[in-house]
């Protein structure tokens, strides 16, 4: 495709990874700033196919280094409107990954790119790359009649663009505030991430934004309208099975179809039971902490360890890939604002830990009576300190601890009774237990066996008193 470019362009390169050892430069990512933004503009304000570079160009960059990065695309056309901005923006991921040797991950303000050594050897500027991406946009989305792009690699300029973009993203996300799942007849699906997560089924409803945070219900509707054969499409939600978990017949049907039968149920607002699949582009990952029966959340920006001793990248690797991983869940940041936020599993009453910056960022989403009860890395760095914090603040999960202990004691008593009532010889597992010391004389102490949370398959068990040899 397109012989005029210094690198190959084809959908076959989607999913290609540029590893660190093969990387010429890294743009954005966890060590720097990375941004992509699409803005609708008047046709007269756009110089078609123009590429502007503000900051060091590719030829000015040092091999192995990481640079700040921002891409601002302006699009124009008779059918172009602001509602389409986020739709076009999400396709940046597709089209950049069509370019051989250029890796693109994530979206919005979390963009992470790498240029391979092989590709960098064939071009000394980002200009042909920009022209290639715009060519793909106008070919695949013909409603875009004119397009220009500005690449920023100067740190101060990237920071300035980032500040402006975050306000734009915030305004976009606020649009679905008063619209809920029960108010609509259709949801929307997105398969953009299937190049990296083949079984991922992203379902976008009014109360649940896409995992990447880039597509809300209105964006899905606009995308399906202008590009019916594209990666965003209608999902007839069908019959309601469970309002609390967010289970619908239509969602289950599409889950089975798009995952090639790997999953047959997705419950939109459940953390544990048939949760939404997680790709790898999610903005935040939730993780269950069994020691406190609570859920923590960690985002891409947090570079430290969570109380469970694991960082974001490790948990993301465990969670992603388009799987349903019980105990982990990827989400978009805006889902924190949903009135149905993991409502099947306690909602905010189950949240026990957040990175401080994320907590500050979503402050308006957190119920007022819980703000001081949710720990950050400044309050708890491990399980023990988290337990102490939650007890001190009387977090709602603490009330479940006593109930769990009582249940455990009851189970223990039942197990003791069962052992006491059992015959001394029984079918058991093909092994003979070591002889156990017995109480001698007139002692009535007997034997006490306590099994806690044990699953034992026994074929034959013999318990006998050891007799002294005469």
From Swiss-Prot:
InterPro entries the UniProt entry points to: ACS_CODH_B_C, CO_DH/Ac-CoA_synth_bsu, CO_DH/Ac-CoA_synth_bsu_3_sf, CO_DH/Ac-CoA_synth_bsu_arc, Prismane-like_sf
Cofactor details (free text): Binds 1 [Ni-Fe-S] cluster.
Pfam families, per database record: ACS_CODH_B_C, CdhC
A single BP term in Gene Ontology: methanogenesis, from acetate
Keyword terms, alphabetized: Acyltransferase, Iron, Iron-sulfur, Metal-binding, Methanogenesis, Nickel, Transferase
Catalytic activity: Co(I)-[corrinoid Fe-S protein] + acetyl-CoA + H(+) = methyl-Co(III)-[corrinoid Fe-S protein] + CO + CoA
Amino-acid positions noted as binding [Ni-Fe-S] cluster in the UniProt annotation, renumbered to this chain: 190, 193, 279, 281
Cofactor (UniProt): [Ni-Fe-S] cluster
E.C. numbers: 2.3.1.169
Pathway: One-carbon metabolism; methanogenesis from acetate
UniProt keyword annotation of Zinc-finger present: no
GO molecular function: acetyltransferase activity; anaerobic carbon-monoxide dehydrogenase activity; CO-methylating acetyl-CoA synthase activity; iron ion binding; iron-sulfur cluster binding; nickel cation binding
Family membership noted in the UniProt record: Belongs to the CdhC family.
Subunit-structure text: Monomer. The ACDS complex is made up of alpha, epsilon, beta, gamma and delta chains with a probable stoichiometry of (alpha(2)epsilon(2))(4)-beta(8)-(gamma(1)delta(1))(8) (Potential).
Job of this protein: Part of a complex that catalyzes the reversible cleavage of acetyl-CoA, allowing growth on acetate as sole source of carbon and energy. The alpha-epsilon complex generates CO from CO(2), while the beta subunit (this protein) combines the CO with CoA and a methyl group to form acetyl-CoA. The methyl group, which is incorporated into acetyl-CoA, is transferred to the beta subunit by a corrinoid iron-sulfur protein (the gamma-delta complex).
Record's protein name: Acetyl-CoA decarbonylase/synthase complex subunit beta 2
Organism of provenance: Methanosarcina mazei (strain ATCC BAA-159 / DSM 3647 / Goe1 / Go1 / JCM 11833 / OCM 88) (Methanosarcina frisia)
Gene from which the chain derives: cdhC2
């Amino acid at each position: 495709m397109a012989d005029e470019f210094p690198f190959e362009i084809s959908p076959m390169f989607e999913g290609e990874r540029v590893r660190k050892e093969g990387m010429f430069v890294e743009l954005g990512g966890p060590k720097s700033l990375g941004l992509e933004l699409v803005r609708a503009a008047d046709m007269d304000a756009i110089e078609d196919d123009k590429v502007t570079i503000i900051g060091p160009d590719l030829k000015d960059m040092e091999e192995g280094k990481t640079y700040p990065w921002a891409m601002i695309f302006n699009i124009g056309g008779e059918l172009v409107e602001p509602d389409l901005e986020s739709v076009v923006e999400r396709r940046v991921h597709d089209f950049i990954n069509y370019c051989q040797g250029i890796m693109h991950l994530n979206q919005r303000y979390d963009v992470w790119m790498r240029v391979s050594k092989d590709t960098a050897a064939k071009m000394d500027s980002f200009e042909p790359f920009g022209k290639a991406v715009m060519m793909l946009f106008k070919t695949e989305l013909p409603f875009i009649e004119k397009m220009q792009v500005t690449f920023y690699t100067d740190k101060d300029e990237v920071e300035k663009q980032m500040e402006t973009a975050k306000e734009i993203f915030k305004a976009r996300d606020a649009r679905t505030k008063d619209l809920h799942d029960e108010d609509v007849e259709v949801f929307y699906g997105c398969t953009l991430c299937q190049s990296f997560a083949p079984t991922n089924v992203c379902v976008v409803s009014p109360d649940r934004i896409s995992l990447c945070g880039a597509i809300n219900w209105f964006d899905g509707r606009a995308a399906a309208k202008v590009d019916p054969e594209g990666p965003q499409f209608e999902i007839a939600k069908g019959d309601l099975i469970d309002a609390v978990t967010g289970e619908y017949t239509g969602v289950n049907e599409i889950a089975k179809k798009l995952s090639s039968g790997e999953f047959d149920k997705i419950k939109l607002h459940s953390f544990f039971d048939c949760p939404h699949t997680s790709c790898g582009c999610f903005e935040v990952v939730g993780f269950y902490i069994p020691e406190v029966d609570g859920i923590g959340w960690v985002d891409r920006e947090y570079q430290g360890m969570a109380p469970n001793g694991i960082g974001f990248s490790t948990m993301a690797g465990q969670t992603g890939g388009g799987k349903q991983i019980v105990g982990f869940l990827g989400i978009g940041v805006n889902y924190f604002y949903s009135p149905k936020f993991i409502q099947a599993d306690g909602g905010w009453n189950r949240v026990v830990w957040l990175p401080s910056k994320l907590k500050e960022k979503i402050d308006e989403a957190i119920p007022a009576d819980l703000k001081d009860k949710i720990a950050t890395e400044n309050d708890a760095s491990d399980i023990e300190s988290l337990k102490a914090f939650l007890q001190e603040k009387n977090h709602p999960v603490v009330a479940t601890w006593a109930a769990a202990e009582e249940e455990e004691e009851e189970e223990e008593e039942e197990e003791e009774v069962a052992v006491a009532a059992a015959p001394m010889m029984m079918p058991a597992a093909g092994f003979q237990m070591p002889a156990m010391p017995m109480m001698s004389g007139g002692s009535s102490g007997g034997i006490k066996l306590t099994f806690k949370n044990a699953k034992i398959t026994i074929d034959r068990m013999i318990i006998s008193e050891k007799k002294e040899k005469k």
